[in-house]
Swiss-Prot record:
Top-level taxon in the UniProt lineage: Eukaryota
Tissues in which the protein is found: Expressed by the venom gland.
Annotated compartments: Secreted
Role according to the record: Probable ion channel inhibitor.
Record's protein name: U10-theraphotoxin-Cg1a 3
Organism in which the protein naturally occurs: Chilobrachys guangxiensis
Amino acid sequence: MKTSVLFVIFGLALLFCLSFADELEDTGRQCGEFMWKCGAGKPTCCSGYDCSPTWKWCVLKSPGRR
């Protein structure tokens, strides 16, 4: 029982560390990639992507989109 509790605690700590490292990497980018939040106060979308006015995230450019 004690071992399983320790595994759960260490697993949650590892998950927290990995998600923090991923978030730290994402905030270091200068532009947003696919499905990245965009809009006021957020980085602009990278080349090849547009900010969707409906969903407020970066989507692939399409020929019909302005």
